[in-house]
Amino acid sequence: MSRPKKPTHAAVTQFVETFLPPKENDVQRLYHTPRNPRYDPETAVVEQIVLSVTPTPGVYSLIGYPLDESTIGATTLLPRIYPRPPRTLCFLHRPFQLDRRSVRKGTLVLSSHTSFDEVLTVGWNTVLAERLGMATADCLCVQGYKGDPERKIGIIGWASKSLDAVLSQVQDEFGASELAYEGSSDEIRIIAIMNAFNEDEVHRVLAMAQERGWIMEGEDGGHLLYLTGQPRVSGMEAAKALGMSVACVGHRQGEDWGIRFLGQELRKAFPGARVEEVYEEEIPVVREKKVPVTQDTAPQ
């Protein structure tokens, strides 16, 4: 039986873009490209794909250069010859602190910040909606946020089940969830997966559900679950006033969900490449302040 064919930089990039379409206000998709003048994404082979929310020590151990562990701090390049590391492509959601000097030659780093937040966290996430039992063909898109009329920040859909059943599914998906507020009913009919949580968005969700006919005029939000990342005071107060249940999974857990999903899809699409997912916190980069150079103007 023949081995699966190894993908190329171009093939993996195009596949990622089927889930994360480029957006004008997003970070550069090809965030870090090999500087070799002979580099060709159509022929550059990928043996290893590394996925992470941010650049972390674990990421650098996979995309960087070997380190000499015999030195203090293990930060000196090894002087000896070692086996060739795998040809690697990396994806980062928040790449802003990437140390490009530490990226191994030939490695491509892809990125998506806005598009990833929009479709692979708690927002317009149709995959998550389907897993929670929402009828996505009939779902409503919550669109327009912070002056951007095109930005999708949520999905609202019908899903008749108990509150406990929904929370159990959310726990399975994210590995963590908190029932921030239990509304006036333990029977959920509508789920709103939202990437924003404030008074205006809570009222917008209720109004959209009413316009669709899922909630009768004058009825409160007791049969609606608002699923989001972080709890916010204004959003919580508005939800409580409407009798609406609120579940929060945490901002980072929402991002990790997207990384896991990409990993699953990449393994299925490219069995010839090893896929590594890194889940750890980024170490803050402390940049040294430049000290102005002063000249001695005293007479000699």
Region annotations inferred by a language model:
Residues M1-Q300:
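Active-site catalytic microenvironments in core metabolic enzymes, especially phosphate/sugar-handling
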